[in-house]
Amino acid sequence: MYVIVEINGQQFKAEEGKKLFVHHIQNAENGATVEFEKVLLVDNNGTVTVGAPTVEGAKVVCEVVSPLVKGDKVLVFHKKRRKGYRKLNGHRQQFTELTIKQVIA
C-alpha cells in the first residue's frame, strides 16, 4: 500500500517505514510526530483511489528523525565574457528528515 501525499508544496510517494527528505518544516522537534492530510492518491494492493482534490479520511503519520538536514551545496556562477565580471554564489537547501510510521486510508 502506498499513497501520494503533498508536503510543503511537493508531492511524495509514501509507504510505511520509508524515509523522506522534505523542505524544512518550521518548529519541528526531534522525535515529534507530524500528520499530513493532503493525500492525493491511495493504492491499496491494486485498488487505486484518486482524490478530487484529496482523499477523504486519509492521512500520513510521520516521525521527525532530524529537524534540520542540509543538502548538497549548489553553486551559481555568473560571468560576462570579455569584461572581467565573475560572481560566484552558493547555498545549501535545508531539509527535514521524516520516517513514515503509519498510512491511514
From Swiss-Prot:
Pfam families: Ribosomal_L21p
GO terms classed as biological process: translation
Superkingdom of this protein's organism: Bacteria
A Gene Ontology cellular-component term: ribonucleoprotein complex
rRNA-binding keyword on record: yes
Keywords in alphabetical order: Ribonucleoprotein, Ribosomal protein, RNA-binding, rRNA-binding
Gene Ontology MF term list: rRNA binding; structural constituent of ribosome
Record keyword Phosphoprotein present: no
NCBIfam families xrefs: L21
Protein family: Belongs to the bacterial ribosomal protein bL21 family.
Record-linked PANTHER family: 50S RIBOSOMAL PROTEIN L21 (PTHR21349), LARGE RIBOSOMAL SUBUNIT PROTEIN BL21M (PTHR21349:SF0)
UniProt-recorded name of the protein: Large ribosomal subunit protein bL21
Organism: Phocaeicola vulgatus (strain ATCC 8482 / DSM 1447 / JCM 5826 / CCUG 4940 / NBRC 14291 / NCTC 11154) (Bacteroides vulgatus)
Lineage of origin: Bacteria, Pseudomonadati, Bacteroidota, Bacteroidia, Bacteroidales
Gene from which the chain derives: rplU
